């Protein structure tokens, strides 16, 4: 199945000059959604991981379904002040400024093998922050899966030290 057929380009969203990749038509098609989740789940099973980690918000949509399909733990990565208990915090750079990602300190166990799932790989800033959070937790990222790879925003070999799945490339 060609998942690209279920992604709609929205010009000038969320701001002028941006072409937003809208995945809601994919989520709204039961066959496409099932195919996407099954494909990511098969990748996760091959990695033999302990836990799935994902950032908000759309990463949660994919990763929670994959965690269910693979019977794996699911750990949230969130922006500041969204997690109620003690957290690890990593600052990372955005195009104009910085942001933070956080994870509960006790959610990952030392030596946990982790796969990170997110909807879009753009510059890699969010993913690098998540890798840093996993390392602070003394766990190990072994792979990552992206629904969409915006190849024009990063180097071709970005994250080549990991097993990486990319379902749609632009």
From Swiss-Prot:
User: Which taxonomic lineage does the organism of this UniProt entry have?
Assistant: Bacteria, Bacillati, Mycoplasmatota, Mollicutes, Mycoplasmataceae
Is this entry keyworded Lipoprotein? Answer: no
Report the GO molecular function annotations. adenine binding; adenine phosphoribosyltransferase activity; AMP binding
Which HAMAP family does the protein's record reference?
Answer: Aden_phosphoribosyltr
Reactions catalysed, as given in the entry: AMP + diphosphate = 5-phospho-alpha-D-ribose 1-diphosphate + adenine
Per the record, the similarity remark reads:
Belongs to the purine/pyrimidine phosphoribosyltransferase family.
**Matching NCBIfam families:** apt (TIGR01090), PRK02304.1-5 (NF002636)
Query: What is the protein name stated in its UniProt record?
Result: Adenine phosphoribosyltransferase
Q: What quaternary arrangement does the UniProt entry report?
A: Homodimer.
Instruction: Write out the annotated subcellular location.
Output: Cytoplasm
**Keyword list, A-Z:** Cytoplasm, Glycosyltransferase, Purine salvage, Transferase
Xref: InterPro entries: Ade_phspho_trans, PRibTrfase_dom, PRTase-like, UPRTase/APRTase
Enzyme class at the top of the EC tree:
transferase
Give the principal location in a single coarse category. cytoplasm
GO biological process, alphabetically ordered? adenine salvage; AMP salvage; purine ribonucleoside salvage
